[in-house]
Amino acid sequence: MTYLVANWKSHHTITQSILWLERLHKLNPTFSPQLKTIICLPFTDLPEFNRQLTEKKLPLLTGAQNVSPFTAGKHTGEVTARMLSELITHCIVGHSERRQQFEETSSLVAQKTFQLLDQGIVPIICLDTPYLEEQIKALIKQDIDPERCLFAYEPQAAIGSGQPVTPHTANQFATKLSFLTSPQVKVLYGGSVTAQNASTFVSQSHIQGILVGTDSLTPTDFSNIINSLS
């Protein structure tokens, strides 16, 4: 199985997300049965996007980009894993932008991961070399089974820069992660992924998919990535 994950970040209103979906439907990309495609949307887009997905019968799954580390309670503004469980199958946690802009720690990411797994949602845990071992230790402390998660290697310098790391470098990181966790762990690569380089990453021995930011925002670019992996 190959994973293709789109991270829309803080882009696309409800109206824009539906227009994106309609355009992708018209482009009619080739979805391989071995390709699992997950669109991680803003919270506000999820209900209507899911409804439109059902109508158009596109083989897409939906995910979120963040989750509360808490269960239900007095936590104003928080969106819990239980709330999301009726809307999504996957959720990104620990993205470098949240670590930088909101000072999220590896411990907090592990708490969020625990909440997601408790509700049957697959966490997509973002990692980079400087905090790799720290994050793994935090997950172990929470008794997280790494084989129930997806991990995304997202080197900070490659995000949105147009300069991805080499496939070999990504594979080396994934190999180290497998050594630290489990040989069966699933690793994605994220950072300036395009239709031109996507297949070079998933062809690596320890890379099972890609996490796409900028090129997931335009239906044509994303359709080209789908076709390149199918």
Language model features: what each stretch is:
Residues 1-230:
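Active-site loop-to-helix "anion-binding N-cap" substructures in soluble metabolic enzymes
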